[in-house]
A protein has these predicted regions:
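Short solvent-exposed loop/turn micro-motifs enriched in small/polar/acidic residues
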Residues: 19, 102-104, 144-145
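Short, cysteine-centered beta-strand-loop-beta hairpins and adjacent loop/turn segments enriched
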Residues: 132-142, 172
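Short beta-strand edge/turn micro-motifs at domain boundaries
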Residues: 1, 118-127, 144-177
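Short beta-strand segments enriched in hydrophobic/aromatic residues
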Residues: 40, 130-132, 165
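Short hydrophobic/aromatic patches at helix-to-coil boundaries
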Residues: 179-182
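A solvent-exposed, acidic/Ser-Thr-rich amphipathic alpha-helical stretch
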Residues: 42-126
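Short, low-complexity N-terminal intrinsically disordered segments enriched in polar/charged residues
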Residues: 1-42, 54
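Charged, gly/pro-rich active-site loop segments
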Residues: 105, 133-135, 148
Length: 182
């Protein structure tokens, strides 16, 4: 494969992954949660650690709570994510009645690990930045900013999220709840 073909393959893969993320954001914004769940592998790990304020130089080992060891905002699999969706869909979920108005913005999508040749990859590691805007009732507004580190797996002709680590850029949660998905 020539350098030009390799570069074109990389661009096509980048565009394909960006389109996947834009589609995922649209599903969440439109409350099409069952379709969103279909974008997740059955063995997904969905993890959002607590963030700590730490001294410079110790952020690598101490800034985030440890997966499977410490408390976390989310440490879930497909079953618990499906239960959360089912609860929202009952119409009696107190934190989502009335429903929130939500927009997901995804940017700075970077494929951080892909096999050479890229476009035929079965799994990819991808980082992205997000901004989630939420408005509830008349005057409750929340803005969440952070980074997602995903493992995407190519399954049945399309991409699915096999692992998602969400780093929220807040050490203290400023919102009343986390009833939506990142």
């Amino acid at each position: 494969m020539s350098a030009r073909e390799t570069a074109i393959d990389a661009l096509l893969l980048q565009r394909e992954i960006e389109a996947f993320y834009y589609h995922e954001a649209e599903l969440l914004d439109d409350r099409r949660f069952d379709a969103w769940l279909d974008l997740l592998t059955d063995d997904i790990v969905y993890f959002m650690p607590l963030r700590r304020n730490v001294k410079y130089g110790s952020q690598e080992e101490a800034e985030n709570s440890a997966e499977g060891v410490d408390a976390a905002w989310f440490d879930e699999g497909k079953h618990t994510l499906s239960q959360r969706v089912a609860q929202i869909k009952t119409g009696i979920h107190w934190a989502e009645e009335p429903l929130s108005r939500i927009r997901h913005l995804v940017t700075n999508v970077q494929i951080t690990d892909a096999p050479p040749g890229g476009h035929g990859a079965r799994e990819l590691d991808v980082k992205s930045r997000f901004l989630v805007y939420r408005n509830r009732i008349d005057d409750e507004t929340d803005i969440f900013v952070g980074q997602r580190t995903d493992r995407l797996r190519h399954v049945d002709g399309g991409w699915k999220v096999a692992r998602r680590v969400i780093l929220l850029d807040q050490s203290t949660l400023l919102a009343k709840n986390l009833t939506f998905f990142f």
